[in-house]
Amino acid sequence: MNIEIIVPGKLSSHLQNVFDFYLKKLKRFANLSVTFTKLGGDVNRESKQVILRREKDEILNKVKNRRFILIDLHGKQMDSISFSKFVENEMLSGELLFVIGGPLGIDDELRKKASLKISLSKMTFTHEFTLVILLEQLFRAFKIINNEKYHY
């Protein structure tokens, strides 16, 4: 299975070890790639809408015409079992594409183009933490799918 995650910005050095840990663990289950796009600009110099529009354009340029799942605070909430069933069903298509919004959120047009919106929590996380949480939940999903213990 191919899994791609598109996220604006860069990963902070303090999260790099956790990111690398889950990338390594997930290699056993899927071909995973993470694409970091440019941030849309400086909020001190430009409006939020201009920045979100730029980020949306960058993301859609990477998405092309593919179906994608948006990680969105207002999306569908699932527990880990439901998410693992979702991933298992998507394995039939051979590809999963996730998009995470940037620090200022998500442009409405990007939200409308998503084939599905999933929320990881009712809480708000930074885009970097969202990436790490998504990686952890993907790893957990594959462990559930393969009927393997998660802890130790």
From Swiss-Prot:
Keyword tags: Cytoplasm, Methyltransferase, rRNA processing, S-adenosyl-L-methionine, Transferase
Family matches, as InterPro entries: Alpha/beta_knot_MTases (IPR029028), RlmH-like (IPR003742), tRNA_m1G_MTases_N (IPR029026)
Listed Pfam families: SPOUT_MTase
One Gene Ontology molecular-function label: rRNA (pseudouridine-N3-)-methyltransferase activity
Catalytic activity: pseudouridine(1915) in 23S rRNA + S-adenosyl-L-methionine = N(3)-methylpseudouridine(1915) in 23S rRNA + S-adenosyl-L-homocysteine + H(+)
Keyword S-adenosyl-L-methionine: yes
EC number assigned by the record: 2.1.1.177
Transmembrane parts of this sequence: none
Domain of life of the native organism: Bacteria
One cellular component (GO) term of this entry: cytoplasm
Residue numbers binding S-adenosyl-L-methionine: 71, 101, 120-125
UniProt xrefs under Gene3D superfamilies: 3.40.1280.10
Subcellular location: Cytoplasm
Signal peptide: none
Function (record text): Specifically methylates the pseudouridine at position 1915 (m3Psi1915) in 23S rRNA.
Protein family per UniProt: Belongs to the RNA methyltransferase RlmH family.
PANTHER family recorded: METHYLTRANSFERASE, RIBOSOMAL RNA LARGE SUBUNIT METHYLTRANSFERASE H
Record text on subunit structure and interactions: Homodimer.
Record protein name field: Ribosomal RNA large subunit methyltransferase H
Organism: Thermosipho africanus (strain TCF52B)
